[in-house]
């Protein structure tokens, strides 16, 4: 049996492994668009733990499991005892006997870490207060689909505009893993922490990428191939009132037509959604031909399929045809003999 692996943070995977996941996702997307649904996860069950409500994450995982022949169970907030009457570890141990893989969207990053450390099955981080690795993978797939003509991913520059959200941190992790140039254009007090920058630095040593944090719009946007933004509330600052939030970010950090004009002519706009129209991005940009936000949303599904197959298929393969034939025959005999009971 292969050693169990989890998808908690992309720092746990090499660039080559990430590229392999991307290739799996793109190949299955192509297959499904051509009408063939590979039944790679037949009879497998995904348990989905949600401490936060979600649209894209839940629908993407459920659809992915159905398309690949499996089944997903939604464990809603308040429906399970996660860290309450029952410890996180006990929940992980029990669910390990009932489902084949777990996905958890949690309030605290330590919760998904504890689930992974205790569960006997793979655990996927569906988002925490630290990072959003499934979004990272979907965004990487989207960037590969929209590479500027004549450029490789390593030649590209991505600029994250605004607050240091989980998605901002994850965008930097993925960009520097792939060898891209990453810039956060955001105000002091709302920039990525030193702990995030250390991971980016280690990634860059291997990949040849770069990272920069700046408040200078011209430096940030120069030659940008991709511009990304997220809502204006981030990883670690105290909750701001709407008035304080607008005063901090508006208008300098709003992605509008003027800001877009400072980037490369072929620039693409990205947003993880949901977006607050008129705040971090204008309608004009969000709905523009260069906006790829709906492609991003679709590629959440592409990423989920890739992750589920990457982490579960080795266990499926290990069973082998001989094992399947053995148990099919034994079950058929048992049921035949017991038919008269």
Curated annotation (Swiss-Prot):
GO terms for cellular component: cytoplasm. InterPro entries: Asp/Orn_carbamoyltranf_P-bd, Asp/Orn_carbamoylTrfase, Asp/Orn_carbamoylTrfase_sf, Asp_carbamoyltransf_Asp/Orn-bd, Orn/put_carbamltrans, PtcA. GO terms for biological process: arginine biosynthetic process via ornithine; citrulline biosynthetic process; putrescine biosynthetic process from arginine via N-carbamoylputrescine. GO terms for molecular function: amino acid binding; ornithine carbamoyltransferase activity; putrescine carbamoyltransferase activity. The record marks 29, 145 as: Important for structural integrity. Disulfide bonds: none annotated. Homotrimer. Belongs to the aspartate/ornithine carbamoyltransferase superfamily. PTCase family. Catalyzes the phosphorolysis of N-carbamoylputrescine to form carbamoyl phosphate and putrescine. Is involved in the degradation pathway of the polyamine agmatine. This is Putrescine carbamoyltransferase. It comes from Listeria monocytogenes serotype 4b (strain CLIP80459). The gene is ptcA.
């Amino acid at each position: 049996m292969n050693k169990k692996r989890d998808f908690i943070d992309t720092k746990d995977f090499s660039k080559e492994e990430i590229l392999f996941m991307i290739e799996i996702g793109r190949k299955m997307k192509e297959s499904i668009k051509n009408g063939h649904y590979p039944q790679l996860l037949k009879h497998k069950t995904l348990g989905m733990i949600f401490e936060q409500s979600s649209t894209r994450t839940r629908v993407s995982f459920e659809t992915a499991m159905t398309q690949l022949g499996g089944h997903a169970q939604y464990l809603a907030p308040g429906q399970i005892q996660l860290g309450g009457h029952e410890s996180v570890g006990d929940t992980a141990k029990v669910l390990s006997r009932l489902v084949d893989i777990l996905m958890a969207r949690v309030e605290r990053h330590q919760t998904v870490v504890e689930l992974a450390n205790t569960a006997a099955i793979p655990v996927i981080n569906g988002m925490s207060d630290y990072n959003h690795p499934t979004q990272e993978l979907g965004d990487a797939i989207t960037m590969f689909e929209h590479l500027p003509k004549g450029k490789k991913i390593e030649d590209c520059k991505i600029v994250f505009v605004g607050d240091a959200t989980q998605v901002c941190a994850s965008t930097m992790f993925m960009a520097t893993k792939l060898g891209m140039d990453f810039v956060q254009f955001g105000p002091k007090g709302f920039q990525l922490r030193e702990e995030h920058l250390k991971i980016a630095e280690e990634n860059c040593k291997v990949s040849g990428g770069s990272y920069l944090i700046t408040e200078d719009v011209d430096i940030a946007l120069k030659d940008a191939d991709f511009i990304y933004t997220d809502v204006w509330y981030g990883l670690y600052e105290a909750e701001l009132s709407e008035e304080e939030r607008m005063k901090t970010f508006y208008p300098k950090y709003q992605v509008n037509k003027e800001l877009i004009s400072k980037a490369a002519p072929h620039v693409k706009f990205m947003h993880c959604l949901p977006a607050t129209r008129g705040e971090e991005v204008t309608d004009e940009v969000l709905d523009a031909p260069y906006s790829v936000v709906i492609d991003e949303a679709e590629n959440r599904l592409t990423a989920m399929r890739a992750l589920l197959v990457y982490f579960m298929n080795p266990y499926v393969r290990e069973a082998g045809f001989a094992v399947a034939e053995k148990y099919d025959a034994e079950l058929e005999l048992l049921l035949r003999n017991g038919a008269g009971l």
